[in-house]
Amino acid sequence: MADELSEKSVEGTEEDGESAPAEGTTEGVPVDEVAKLRQELEDVKRIADERLEQLLRCRAELDNVIKRNSREREELARFASEAIIKKLLVFLDSLEQAAKHDEGAKALYDQLLDIMRSEGLEPIDAVGKKFDPFVHEAMMQVESQEAEDGIVVQEFQKGYTLHSRVIRTSKVAVAKHG
């Protein structure tokens, strides 16, 4: 049987015109060379994986920058009118005082307030509410038997929010039991 194998292998090499690979080789390439090529392939795959991971992290970071930039632009657009609205609050306060005595001034006050509301301005409700230091500024405490401690009993100046952000606190008097 061993003779048949050696004859076939000799015949195969004679028919192909090629010699059989030498011992310690793979298809005519030395084993050392194959091991070296495999190592290089593994190194290249590892580097490719590292680069892919790096690329994915960069892409995620870019997406985050784009989202943050978009949010900042939206917020800037929302609050671009804040400076002018703050300046108009003084006029709105004066018009509100005049509206208490004059119907024409009341109509103007209502129109201006509607315009400013359409831009996101909202008055802060104060009287009768629990004192909140985020929206109220206590100007004084008033002894009161009717109101509970910490309840706003008087408003000296109206406060406002712009798109739910306080742009001016309400100036108030807060009840305390005496």
Swiss-Prot record:
Residues 1-11 have a biased composition (Basic and acidic residues). GO terms for cellular component: cytoplasm. GO terms for biological process: protein folding. Residues 1-32 are annotated as: Disordered. One of its GO terms (molecular function) is unfolded protein binding. CDD domains: GrpE (cd00446). It is found in: Cytoplasm. InterPro entries: GrpE (IPR000740), GrpE_coiled_coil (IPR013805), GrpE_head (IPR009012). Participates actively in the response to hyperosmotic and heat shock by preventing the aggregation of stress-denatured proteins, in association with DnaK and GrpE. It is the nucleotide exchange factor for DnaK and may function as a thermosensor. Unfolded proteins bind initially to DnaJ; upon interaction with the DnaJ-bound protein, DnaK hydrolyzes its bound ATP, resulting in the formation of a stable complex. GrpE releases ADP from DnaK; ATP binding to DnaK triggers the release of the substrate protein, thus completing the reaction cycle. Belongs to the GrpE family. This is Protein GrpE. It comes from Methanothrix thermoacetophila (strain DSM 6194 / JCM 14653 / NBRC 101360 / PT). The gene is grpE.
